[in-house]
Curated annotation (Swiss-Prot):
The active site is at D57. It comes from Streptococcus thermophilus (strain ATCC BAA-250 / LMG 18311). This is NAD kinase. It is an enzyme of class 2 (transferase). Involved in the regulation of the intracellular balance of NAD and NADP, and is a key enzyme in the biosynthesis of NADP. Catalyzes specifically the phosphorylation on 2'-hydroxyl of the adenosine moiety of NAD to yield NADP. HAMAP family: NAD_kinase (MF_00361). It catalyses: NAD(+) + ATP = ADP + NADP(+) + H(+). Its cofactor is a divalent metal cation.
Length: 279
Protein backbone atom coordinates (compact mmCIF):
# COMPACT_ATOMS: atom_id res chain seq x y z
CA UNK A 1 0.00 0.00 0.00
CA UNK A 2 1.40 3.41 -0.99
CA UNK A 3 0.49 6.54 0.97
CA UNK A 4 1.54 10.18 0.88
CA UNK A 5 2.81 11.91 4.00
CA UNK A 6 2.68 15.63 4.59
CA UNK A 7 5.81 17.38 3.36
CA UNK A 8 7.86 19.49 5.73
CA UNK A 9 10.51 22.16 5.32
CA UNK A 10 12.43 20.68 8.26
CA UNK A 11 15.62 18.72 7.71
CA UNK A 12 15.27 14.97 7.30
CA UNK A 13 16.57 12.90 10.22
CA UNK A 14 18.59 9.99 8.83
CA UNK A 15 20.03 6.94 10.60
CA UNK A 16 22.63 4.75 8.89
CA UNK A 17 23.24 1.16 9.96
CA UNK A 18 25.69 -1.18 8.23
CA UNK A 19 27.03 -4.68 8.70
CA UNK A 20 30.74 -5.29 9.23
CA UNK A 21 31.73 -6.02 5.63
CA UNK A 22 34.36 -3.67 4.14
CA UNK A 23 32.12 -2.67 1.24
CA UNK A 24 29.27 -1.86 3.63
CA UNK A 25 31.58 0.34 5.68
CA UNK A 26 32.73 2.15 2.54
CA UNK A 27 29.14 2.83 1.50
CA UNK A 28 28.29 4.03 5.02
CA UNK A 29 31.29 6.36 4.99
CA UNK A 30 30.21 7.84 1.65
CA UNK A 31 26.71 8.48 3.00
CA UNK A 32 28.03 10.03 6.22
CA UNK A 33 30.25 12.39 4.24
CA UNK A 34 27.40 13.33 1.91
CA UNK A 35 24.88 14.03 4.69
CA UNK A 36 27.17 15.51 7.33
CA UNK A 37 27.39 19.05 5.94
CA UNK A 38 24.11 19.07 4.02
CA UNK A 39 21.53 21.41 5.60
CA UNK A 40 18.69 19.22 4.30
CA UNK A 41 19.76 16.24 6.43
CA UNK A 42 20.52 15.55 10.08
CA UNK A 43 22.37 12.37 11.00
CA UNK A 44 21.00 10.74 14.14
CA UNK A 45 20.04 7.29 15.38
CA UNK A 46 17.41 8.78 17.69
CA UNK A 47 13.89 9.09 16.22
CA UNK A 48 14.98 9.05 12.56
CA UNK A 49 12.62 9.77 9.70
CA UNK A 50 14.52 7.43 7.39
CA UNK A 51 16.72 4.48 8.28
CA UNK A 52 19.26 3.34 5.70
CA UNK A 53 20.26 -0.31 6.10
CA UNK A 54 23.50 -1.30 4.37
CA UNK A 55 24.24 -4.99 3.84
CA UNK A 56 21.63 -7.59 3.05
CA UNK A 57 18.19 -8.73 4.11
CA UNK A 58 19.61 -9.97 7.42
CA UNK A 59 20.88 -6.48 8.20
CA UNK A 60 17.49 -4.98 7.38
CA UNK A 61 15.78 -7.53 9.65
CA UNK A 62 18.10 -6.47 12.48
CA UNK A 63 17.46 -2.79 11.77
CA UNK A 64 13.71 -3.43 11.74
CA UNK A 65 13.81 -4.98 15.21
CA UNK A 66 16.06 -2.20 16.52
CA UNK A 67 13.39 0.35 15.54
CA UNK A 68 10.24 -1.74 15.91
CA UNK A 69 8.88 0.69 18.52
CA UNK A 70 9.17 3.59 16.07
CA UNK A 71 7.39 2.09 13.06
CA UNK A 72 4.78 4.85 12.98
CA UNK A 73 7.54 7.35 12.22
CA UNK A 74 10.45 5.68 10.46
CA UNK A 75 10.69 4.60 6.82
CA UNK A 76 13.31 2.09 5.73
CA UNK A 77 15.50 1.91 2.66
CA UNK A 78 18.02 -0.84 1.91
CA UNK A 79 21.35 -0.82 0.10
CA UNK A 80 22.65 -4.27 -0.81
CA UNK A 81 26.43 -4.58 -0.85
CA UNK A 82 26.47 -7.54 -3.19
CA UNK A 83 23.65 -8.76 -5.39
CA UNK A 84 20.12 -7.40 -5.06
CA UNK A 85 18.40 -8.43 -1.84
CA UNK A 86 14.69 -8.98 -1.43
CA UNK A 87 14.15 -5.95 0.81
CA UNK A 88 16.71 -3.67 -0.86
CA UNK A 89 16.06 -1.12 -3.60
CA UNK A 90 19.60 0.06 -4.22
CA UNK A 91 22.92 -1.54 -5.09
CA UNK A 92 26.15 -0.21 -3.60
CA UNK A 93 26.85 1.45 -6.98
CA UNK A 94 23.65 3.51 -6.70
CA UNK A 95 24.44 5.58 -3.59
CA UNK A 96 24.33 8.88 -5.47
CA UNK A 97 20.91 7.95 -6.84
CA UNK A 98 19.64 7.26 -3.30
CA UNK A 99 20.97 10.58 -2.02
CA UNK A 100 19.19 12.43 -4.82
CA UNK A 101 15.98 10.48 -4.14
CA UNK A 102 16.05 11.49 -0.46
CA UNK A 103 16.82 15.09 -1.39
CA UNK A 104 13.62 15.19 -3.47
CA UNK A 105 11.62 13.05 -1.02
CA UNK A 106 7.95 13.92 -0.59
CA UNK A 107 7.35 11.55 2.31
CA UNK A 108 5.70 8.87 0.18
CA UNK A 109 5.88 5.35 1.54
CA UNK A 110 5.04 1.75 0.71
CA UNK A 111 3.81 -0.32 3.67
CA UNK A 112 3.75 -4.06 4.31
CA UNK A 113 1.87 -6.05 7.00
CA UNK A 114 3.60 -7.57 10.03
CA UNK A 115 3.01 -10.65 12.17
CA UNK A 116 2.02 -10.38 15.84
CA UNK A 117 3.18 -13.31 17.99
CA UNK A 118 1.94 -13.82 21.55
CA UNK A 119 3.48 -16.60 23.65
CA UNK A 120 1.64 -17.66 26.82
CA UNK A 121 3.26 -19.99 29.38
CA UNK A 122 1.50 -22.39 31.73
CA UNK A 123 2.12 -20.07 34.71
CA UNK A 124 0.18 -17.28 32.99
CA UNK A 125 3.09 -15.14 31.86
CA UNK A 126 2.88 -13.88 28.28
CA UNK A 127 5.30 -12.28 25.84
CA UNK A 128 4.54 -10.47 22.59
CA UNK A 129 6.79 -10.00 19.56
CA UNK A 130 6.40 -8.86 15.97
CA UNK A 131 7.92 -10.39 12.86
CA UNK A 132 8.66 -9.01 9.42
CA UNK A 133 9.12 -12.46 7.84
CA UNK A 134 7.85 -15.34 9.94
CA UNK A 135 7.65 -17.17 13.25
CA UNK A 136 7.98 -20.91 13.81
CA UNK A 137 7.43 -23.19 16.78
CA UNK A 138 9.20 -26.54 17.20
CA UNK A 139 9.56 -29.05 19.99
CA UNK A 140 13.16 -29.65 21.01
CA UNK A 141 12.73 -33.33 21.86
CA UNK A 142 10.73 -35.86 19.87
CA UNK A 143 7.71 -35.07 17.72
CA UNK A 144 5.66 -31.94 18.33
CA UNK A 145 1.98 -32.54 19.04
CA UNK A 146 -0.36 -29.56 19.05
CA UNK A 147 -3.96 -28.53 18.51
CA UNK A 148 -4.34 -25.83 15.89
CA UNK A 149 -7.31 -23.47 16.28
CA UNK A 150 -8.63 -20.84 13.89
CA UNK A 151 -10.53 -18.09 15.71
CA UNK A 152 -10.62 -20.32 18.82
CA UNK A 153 -12.25 -23.21 16.92
CA UNK A 154 -10.27 -26.46 16.64
CA UNK A 155 -9.10 -26.99 13.07
CA UNK A 156 -6.69 -29.92 13.34
CA UNK A 157 -4.48 -31.91 15.71
CA UNK A 158 -0.95 -31.64 14.36
CA UNK A 159 1.92 -34.12 14.63
CA UNK A 160 5.29 -33.32 13.11
CA UNK A 161 8.45 -31.24 13.48
CA UNK A 162 6.72 -27.87 13.84
CA UNK A 163 4.61 -25.09 12.37
CA UNK A 164 5.54 -21.88 10.58
CA UNK A 165 3.42 -18.73 10.19
CA UNK A 166 4.58 -16.11 7.69
CA UNK A 167 3.67 -12.63 6.49
CA UNK A 168 3.13 -11.98 2.76
CA UNK A 169 6.69 -10.65 2.34
CA UNK A 170 7.96 -13.48 4.54
CA UNK A 171 6.24 -15.99 2.29
CA UNK A 172 9.33 -15.84 0.08
CA UNK A 173 11.66 -16.85 2.95
CA UNK A 174 11.46 -19.96 5.19
CA UNK A 175 7.85 -20.51 4.16
CA UNK A 176 8.84 -20.98 0.52
CA UNK A 177 11.45 -23.59 1.44
CA UNK A 178 8.67 -25.52 3.21
CA UNK A 179 6.58 -25.58 0.03
CA UNK A 180 4.38 -22.63 0.95
CA UNK A 181 2.85 -20.25 -1.57
CA UNK A 182 4.28 -16.84 -2.44
CA UNK A 183 1.74 -14.23 -1.32
CA UNK A 184 1.54 -10.65 -2.59
CA UNK A 185 1.82 -8.14 0.33
CA UNK A 186 -1.33 -6.27 -0.68
CA UNK A 187 -3.16 -9.41 0.47
CA UNK A 188 -3.12 -8.81 4.22
CA UNK A 189 -3.13 -12.41 5.36
CA UNK A 190 -1.07 -14.99 7.23
CA UNK A 191 0.17 -18.29 5.89
CA UNK A 192 0.33 -21.39 8.09
CA UNK A 193 2.75 -24.02 6.81
CA UNK A 194 3.47 -27.42 8.33
CA UNK A 195 7.03 -28.57 8.97
CA UNK A 196 7.38 -32.30 8.20
CA UNK A 197 3.89 -33.30 9.34
CA UNK A 198 2.99 -36.93 10.04
CA UNK A 199 0.14 -38.16 7.89
CA UNK A 200 -0.95 -41.79 8.18
CA UNK A 201 -3.92 -43.85 9.37
CA UNK A 202 -3.48 -42.59 12.92
CA UNK A 203 -2.54 -38.92 12.44
CA UNK A 204 -4.13 -36.71 9.79
CA UNK A 205 -3.53 -33.02 9.09
CA UNK A 206 -4.47 -30.82 6.15
CA UNK A 207 -0.98 -31.28 4.74
CA UNK A 208 -1.19 -28.05 2.72
CA UNK A 209 -0.34 -24.39 3.38
CA UNK A 210 -3.29 -22.45 4.78
CA UNK A 211 -4.02 -18.78 4.00
CA UNK A 212 -5.74 -17.01 6.91
CA UNK A 213 -7.30 -13.55 6.34
CA UNK A 214 -6.42 -10.38 8.21
CA UNK A 215 -8.99 -10.43 11.00
CA UNK A 216 -8.62 -14.10 11.92
CA UNK A 217 -6.25 -15.60 14.48
CA UNK A 218 -4.19 -18.79 14.51
CA UNK A 219 -3.60 -20.38 17.92
CA UNK A 220 -1.28 -23.34 18.53
CA UNK A 221 -1.75 -25.34 21.76
CA UNK A 222 1.10 -27.81 22.40
CA UNK A 223 -0.38 -30.98 23.92
CA UNK A 224 2.87 -32.40 25.27
CA UNK A 225 5.07 -30.92 27.97
CA UNK A 226 8.69 -30.25 27.14
CA UNK A 227 11.07 -27.69 25.72
CA UNK A 228 9.97 -25.65 22.71
CA UNK A 229 11.82 -23.27 20.42
CA UNK A 230 9.94 -20.24 19.13
CA UNK A 231 11.79 -18.36 16.38
CA UNK A 232 10.65 -14.87 15.42
CA UNK A 233 12.58 -13.67 12.37
CA UNK A 234 16.23 -13.87 13.43
CA UNK A 235 15.48 -14.18 17.15
CA UNK A 236 15.15 -17.48 19.02
CA UNK A 237 13.37 -18.16 22.32
CA UNK A 238 13.47 -21.47 24.21
CA UNK A 239 10.74 -22.11 26.79
CA UNK A 240 9.28 -24.97 28.78
CA UNK A 241 5.61 -25.41 29.66
CA UNK A 242 4.24 -23.49 26.68
CA UNK A 243 0.46 -23.13 26.97
CA UNK A 244 -0.25 -21.52 23.60
CA UNK A 245 1.13 -19.33 20.83
CA UNK A 246 -1.20 -16.89 19.05
CA UNK A 247 -0.50 -15.48 15.58
CA UNK A 248 -2.32 -12.53 13.99
CA UNK A 249 -1.76 -9.55 11.69
CA UNK A 250 -0.26 -6.73 13.73
CA UNK A 251 -1.85 -3.28 13.76
CA UNK A 252 1.51 -1.77 12.80
CA UNK A 253 3.21 -1.98 9.41
CA UNK A 254 6.72 -1.55 8.12
CA UNK A 255 7.14 1.33 5.67
CA UNK A 256 9.74 1.78 2.94
CA UNK A 257 10.71 4.95 1.10
CA UNK A 258 8.66 5.03 -2.10
CA UNK A 259 10.56 6.06 -5.19
CA UNK A 260 11.01 5.18 -8.84
CA UNK A 261 13.66 2.69 -7.68
CA UNK A 262 11.29 0.81 -5.38
CA UNK A 263 11.13 -2.57 -7.08
CA UNK A 264 7.70 -4.15 -7.51
CA UNK A 265 7.00 -7.28 -5.47
CA UNK A 266 6.78 -9.63 -8.44
CA UNK A 267 9.96 -8.20 -9.93
CA UNK A 268 11.69 -8.89 -6.60
CA UNK A 269 10.41 -12.46 -6.67
CA UNK A 270 11.61 -12.98 -10.22
CA UNK A 271 15.04 -11.46 -9.57
CA UNK A 272 15.49 -13.42 -6.33
CA UNK A 273 14.44 -16.87 -7.52
CA UNK A 274 14.38 -16.96 -11.33
CA UNK A 275 16.79 -14.34 -12.66
CA UNK A 276 17.11 -13.28 -16.24
CA UNK A 277 15.58 -15.73 -18.68
CA UNK A 278 17.62 -16.45 -21.80
CA UNK A 279 15.76 -16.46 -25.08
Amino acid sequence: MMTQMKTSSDEMKVAIIANGKPQSRRVASKLFNAFRDDPDFYLTKKNPDVLISIGGDGMLLSAFHMYEKELARVRFVGIHTGHLGFYTDYLDSEVDQLIETLRKDSGAKISYPLLNVKLTLADGRSFTSIALNEAAIKRNEKTMAADVCLNDVLFESFRGDGLSVSTPTGSTAYNKSLGGAVLHPTIEALQLTEIASLNNRVYRTLGSPLIVPKHEKITVYPTRMGSYTLSVDNKTYINRNVKKVEFSIDQRKISFVASASHTSFWERVRESFIGDMEE
